Amino acid sequence: MATTKNFKIPREKLKTFVRGKGFCIAPDTVLVDGIPVSLIYRVMPSSLYDSGWRFFTGTESDEYLANARYNGVYDLNTVVNYCPEAIHLLDSPPYTAFRRDEYGEWINISYDVDWRYWF
């Protein structure tokens, strides 16, 4: 029996920030628990509809992320509702990564990432 997730932002409250940008991956820590996004990165899209974007809070363990029950594929606009301050980053190319600093500003960490880890 499938379970229904109780998203922090109900569907009817979602705003339209972006259209037609594809889908992304995000865990329940963002969409259900409402913990602020602190790490985003973009990989090469795996399909026509994949934006390549991945969003995380930074609190997720490897075990948590390995459990498909706690992760989902969502329209990019849905996830951007949880961190609209990242909209200006969405046109960044694949193999780009950002994390928030102690002031909440996005810092480009693309050169600090071992991209082999993600594949």
Question: For each predicted feature, which ranges?
Answer:
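Acidic, aromatic-enriched beta-alpha/helix-loop junctions
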Residues: 40-90
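Short, compact, well-ordered microdomains
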Residues: 73-118
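Amphipathic, interaction-prone secondary-structure segments
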Residues: 23-49
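Short low-complexity stretches enriched in small and charged residues
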Residues: 6-15, 54, 62-65
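Short, basic/low-complexity N-terminal boundary segments at the transition from targeting/disordered tails
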Residues: 2-14, 76-81
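Short acidic, Pro/Gly- and aromatic-enriched capping/linker segments at domain boundaries
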Residues: 10-28
